[in-house]
């Protein structure tokens, strides 16, 4: 039996809640063994496709850099759930404190679940590139000053 809308949405929201904790093992526990992760736009310089294992270092880097990190569905942004395709689309707000100051951005997550609807098989993340560009300059300046 295919997962219901509520089951798919619950898995997606649980994944976002675990992601916000920035604990690599918690995040990875929601990803199927064959999960692929895609980050866009390509101007951010991320590999176009990562496996679950390849993404582990990225999650660890986030944990080392942020505290008080929050992810949530943006107010007024109704999730889109495609039951036959087992996909959930979320408009996410991200906020937190980092080594270089306050961070606030937005993402679009497209999550495709496994046949049971319990794990993420494909994670497509589209990030606010203007915020990421400005923030990247802060990071570069921070680490240049330390060297």
UniProtKB/Swiss-Prot annotation:
This is Austinoid biosynthesis clusters protein H. GO terms for biological process: terpenoid biosynthetic process. Part of the gene cluster B that mediates the biosynthesis of the fungal meroterpenoid acetoxydehydroaustin. The first step of the pathway is the synthesis of 3,5-dimethylorsellinic acid by the polyketide synthase ausA. 3,5-dimethylorsellinic acid is then prenylated by the polyprenyl transferase ausN. Further epoxidation by the FAD-dependent monooxygenase ausM and cyclization by the probable terpene cyclase ausL lead to the formation of protoaustinoid A. Pathway: Secondary metabolite biosynthesis; terpenoid biosynthesis. Transmembrane segments: none annotated. In A.calidoustus, the austinoid gene cluster lies on a contiguous DNA region, while clusters from E.nidulans and P.brasilianum are split in their respective genomes. Genetic rearrangements provoked variability among the clusters and E.nidulans produces the least number of austionoid derivatives with the end products austinol and dehydroaustinol, while P.brasilianum can produce until acetoxydehydroaustin, and A.calidoustus produces the highest number of identified derivatives. Belongs to the trt14 isomerase family. It comes from Penicillium brasilianum. Homodimer. SUPFAM superfamilies: NTF2-like.
């Amino acid at each position: 039996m295919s997962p219901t809308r509520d089951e798919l949405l619950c898995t997606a929201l649980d994944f976002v809640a675990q992601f916000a904790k920035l604990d690599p093992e918690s995040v990875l526990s929601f990803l199927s063994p064959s999960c692929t992760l895609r980050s866009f736009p390509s101007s951010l310089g991320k590999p176009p496709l990562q496996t679950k294992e390849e993404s582990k270092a990225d999650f660890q880097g986030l944990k080392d850099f942020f505290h008080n990190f929050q992810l949530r569905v943006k107010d007024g942004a109704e999730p889109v759930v495609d039951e036959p395709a087992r996909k959930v689309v979320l408009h996410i707000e991200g906020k937190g404190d980092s080594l270089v100051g306050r961070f606030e951005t937005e993402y679009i997550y497209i999550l495709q679940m496994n046949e049971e609807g319990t794990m993420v098989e494909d994670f497509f993340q589209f990030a606010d590139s203007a915020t990421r560009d400005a923030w990247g300059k802060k990071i570069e300046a921070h680490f240049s000053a330390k060297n």
